[in-house]
Amino acid sequence: MRSFTNLNPCYVLLPFFLVLATNATHTNNFLPRPRTGYYGSACWNVESIVRSVVESNYLANPANAPGILRMHFHDCFVQGCDASVLLAGPNSERTAIPNLSLRGFNVIEEAKTQLEIACPRTVSCADILALAARDFVHLAGGPWWPVPLGRLDGRISLASNVILPGPTDSVAVQKLRFAEKNLNTQDLVVLAAGHTIGTAGCIVFRDRFFNYDNTGSPDPTIAPSFVPLIQAQCPLNGDPATRVVLDTGSGDQFDTSYLNNLKNGRGLLESDQVLWTNLETRPIVERLLGLRFPFLIFGLEFARSMTKMSQIEIKTGLDGEIRRVCSAVN
């Protein structure tokens, strides 16, 4: 069993620039939202309740860490961070092809159930998802950061609205998708490096290792030694749903290993490998790896970018609600 008391203290971050406000209760409508300390005495133990649920589920299945991180990303990039991805039903976001492999819905519902007992009708599912993503990243060895709270849950969830960055996207397309959400190129590289944990299905990348762009050969940017390794795990006639670790050699640890793999031509996804071959994004990767000055500290930059992402198009006022259960509107 993994101990949570031995996490790298350098990754426990308390940057003042992430703290929007403190000691504010959710009854004061004159203060901005989201903000840290939003719930105040109305639900003073919200973070400890979520953390407890996250810890038990991480111990039960560490794969919940990349699962919830990916879910948070998919939620925020479609109509903002409003937990619309959690809504179940015909033609909801959950039914869109990119979301069919999402996992961890039960974790968020478990936290919601406990919070409804402790603080009825107070904490939004969107806030729970943001907190859970932070806590799972931290348990996997990544940074901790203050999460501004006060999001409301959305009432609309449509599969037709799901437009997400794809695994074969060029840097230009990825930049466009991120810019639409007011995220810059550095945010793009840093958040893509979240692939340091998790897996991908063979169907997403197999052609790249066998028949790239219908050439009958692998993508020439892939390291020759990496090709047979992936081909063995994802044979042409194999199950397309087979999962392969994104970060070869360090798939369950949040670190810079995946970025180093990109440098060595061992990126599993084309959309990630192009971050090294592109002249604009490569210097950012180098700075995160400590190969180019001024250096960037991955944990610190990931916390910054996650904080920005978690505030995309949030719902406030009459635009949202506090759901009683996360899978259905009130």
UniProtKB/Swiss-Prot annotation:
The lineage of its organism: Eukaryota, Viridiplantae, Streptophyta, Embryophyta, Tracheophyta. Transmembrane segments: none annotated. PANTHER family: PEROXIDASE 25-RELATED (PTHR31235). GO terms for molecular function: heme binding; lactoperoxidase activity; metal ion binding. Disulfide bonds join 43-119, 76-81, 125-326, 202-234. It catalyses: 2 a phenolic donor + H2O2 = 2 a phenolic radical donor + 2 H2O. It comes from Arabidopsis thaliana (Mouse-ear cress). One of its GO terms (biological process) is response to oxidative stress. Belongs to the peroxidase family. Classical plant (class III) peroxidase subfamily. Ca(2+) 1 binds at residues 75, 78, 80, 82, 84. It is an enzyme of class 1 (oxidoreductase). One of its GO terms (cellular component) is extracellular region. Ca(2+) 2 binds at residues 196, 247, 250, 255. Substrate binds at residue 165. The record marks 70 as: Transition state stabilizer. Binds 1 heme b (iron(II)-protoporphyrin IX) group per subunit. Its cofactor is heme b; Ca(2+). Pfam families: peroxidase. Keywords: Calcium, Disulfide bond, Heme, Hydrogen peroxide, Iron, Metal-binding, Oxidoreductase, Peroxidase, Secreted, Signal. It is found in: Secreted. Its EC number is 1.11.1.7. There are 73 peroxidase genes in A.thaliana. It comes from the Eukaryota. This is Peroxidase 70. Removal of H(2)O(2), oxidation of toxic reductants, biosynthesis and degradation of lignin, suberization, auxin catabolism, response to environmental stresses such as wounding, pathogen attack and oxidative stress. These functions might be dependent on each isozyme/isoform in each plant tissue.
